[in-house]
Regions:
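Ligand-binding clefts of soluble mixed alpha/beta catalytic domains
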Residues: 2-550
Length: 550
């Protein structure tokens, strides 16, 4: 850090090189500004920067430069210093107070940003540090720009006392005020502990870095003292813990640059605020019918579904074939793998995809999948992104663990989120849509705008095996008493049930699906539906807010 001695009587400043700057001249004032600005680049000295680099990490400022378009960053409050004199802090007043704030562009689009500096008081939050974040939050809301937070800090600055807690509360409150107004994205680039974890939890997306990021409220030492448990930081709050187990993380990056690349991709699908439409690429409207514009990828969908309804297939194969350029930005890929969520485009239109995954639990919905999908649907609805559901769901996952942990209440979140959403909603039933899960996964009666089914769709109260056991219980028991072949009778009855009810045509006759289409026509139907629904208008009933079953 630059060593400076001020001689107030002589109105001069002595720089590290020994050159005295006369701050009463214009040239001297400019030189003094340059000195101060240079000091902001290494607020606690170059040795601290070297230690960060030795760990393979970037500094707070370097992270901002790496994420934003080159030369676009405009810094705010770079010269701010804390005001505390307690516990020797008066002798340590680094410029910036441990957080870099400002605004710039990503792919030419304006964003606001803050980046926490773990080299300054361990990244702990004090009064001025907190005020800087509050200020950039308010600027983002006022200007309708996405807010990106790069988090690398260790909780409250204990030396500053309760004022740190007050600023935490202001930050949390602003996160809540901004929710659904501007996209909020958090990158966790180090150990975020204590109060530092709640602000990211209130944002729309959290990106963590493998083997670098940790998030926890209480650390391993406290847990050991209180509960006797031995756990490492990585086990407790590492990136994969929060992806695979807690569902807190939305993406686990292989390194810092991968994290920045993901955020840039993510922003390409999001509008700047809730009054704007998501980015749309200019794609010519195809001439002729859907049939006239089929591609090889479209035709591949006709052979994707196995003949056996019990044989799984990878729903990713459907997703990539209906999206532009096979590009799908998946969200929370490692959590609740029985449901797939993410962003893509159809004929240039941004869409949010929610799809059952038959390779995991046969596509059944469980607690985690329900909450994962519900949160994503609400995010899409906040930012005017149409929702496309791809349905192959045999029901809710049975079991005492699910029941005891609240599948009724927590599964209802998905019902609520879908029914509440006012954006364009399109449903494609590829195979199974049974029972209550049919209702939850974008049924016409739950407010879907366009519902189509493939010929392979099985729309019914339950599958043939369960239905036959229930409907023909007495007949099967009588057959057993008479010494008849019960297994053969059961198979016959199952086939009759499937032929009569387990198909898409009963639902089509009643208008519960708008059309039964060849799988190859799916992309075309979605594209025409999106064009139709661009002007969709919904007038919700007046109320303060609903009461989602949290």
């Amino acid at each position: 850090m630059t060593s400076v001695s001020e001689h107030s009587g002589e109105h001069s400043v002595e720089a590290r090189e020994g050159h005295v700057i006369d701050i009463h001249t214009t040239a001297g004032k400019l030189a003094d500004l340059k000195r101060r600005t240079e000091e902001t680049l290494h607020p606690v000295g170059e040795a601290a920067v070297d230690r960060v680099h030795a760990k393979g990490k970037l500094t707070a400022r370097e992270r901002v430069y790496a994420l934003l378009d080159e030369g676009s960053f405009v810094e705010l409050d770079a010269l701010a210093k804390h005001r505390s004199t307690n516990f020797g802090l008066g002798d340590k007043r680094p410029l910036g107070d441990g957080v870099v704030t400002g605004y710039g562009t990503i792919d030419g689009r304006e964003v606001c940003i803050f980046s926490q500096d773990a080299t300054v008081f361990g990244g702990s939050l004090g009064e001025v540090y907190g005020e800087k974040i509050v200020k950039i939050q308010e600027l983002a809301m006022k200007t309708g720009r996405p807010l990106i937070g790069i988090n690398d800090g260790a909780g409250a600055r204990i030396q500053e006392g309760v004022v740190s807690l007050g600023l935490y509360s202001k930050i949390f409150h602003n996160n809540i005020l901004a929710s659904g107004v501007i996209p909020q994205i958090s990158l966790i680039m180090g150990a975020a502990a204590g109060g530092h974890v709640y602000s990211p939890a209130l944002t729309d997306f959290i990106v963590m870095v493998d083997q670098t990021s940790q998030m926890f409220i209480t650390g391993p030492d406290v847990i050991k003292t209180v509960t006797g448990e031995d756990v490492t930081q990585e086990e407790l709050g590492g990136a994969h813990t929060h992806m695979d187990k807690s569902g807190t993380a939305h993406y686990v990056a292989s390194g810092e640059q991968d994290a920045f690349d993901y955020v840039r991709d993510l922003l390409s699908y999001l509008p700047p605020n809730n009054y704007a439409d998501p980015p749309q690429l200019s794609v010519p409207v195809p001439e002729g019918s859907i049939e006239d514009n089929l591609t090889e990828e479209d035709l591949e969908l006709n052979t994707l579904i196995p003949d056996s309804p019990n044989q799984p297939y990878d729903m990713h194969e459907v997703i990539t074939r209906i999206l532009d350029d096979d590009e799908f930005l998946e969200v929370q890929a490692g959590y609740a793998r029985n449901i797939i969520i993410g962003f893509g485009r159809v004929d240039g239109h941004t869409v949010g995809i929610v799809a059952n995954q038959p390779t995991q639990f046969a596509g059944c919905l469980d607690i985690n999948a329900s909450e994962k999908a519900a949160r994503f649907i609400r995010t899409c609805d906040c930012f005017n992104i149409p929702i496309v559901l791809l349905v192959d769901v045999p029901g809710f996952l049975p079991g005492t663990e699910q029941e005891y942990n609240g599948i009724i209440r927590r599964g209802a979140k998905l019902l609520y989120a879908y029914g509440e959403a006012t954006v364009a909603k399109i449903t494609v039933i590829t195979r199974k849509a049974y029972g209550g899960a049919y209702c939850v996964m974008g049924s016409k009666e739950m407010g879907a705008d366009v519902n189509v089914a493939w010929p392979t769709a099985q729309i019914a109260v339950m599958g043939a095996s369960g239905a036959v056991g229930f409907v023909y219980r007495q007949q099967l028991a009588a057959a057993a008493d008479n010494g008849e072949d019960v297994d053969a009778l059961r198979l016959q009855l199952q086939q009759e049930y499937e032929d009569t009810l387990v198909n898409p045509y009963v639902a089509a006759e009643r208008g519960y699906v708008d059309a039964v289409i060849p799988p190859s026509h799916t992309r075309g139907y979605i594209a025409t539906s999106l064009r139709l629904l661009e002007r969709k208008i919904v007038q919700p009933l007046p109320k303060k807010h609903g009461n989602i079953p949290l």
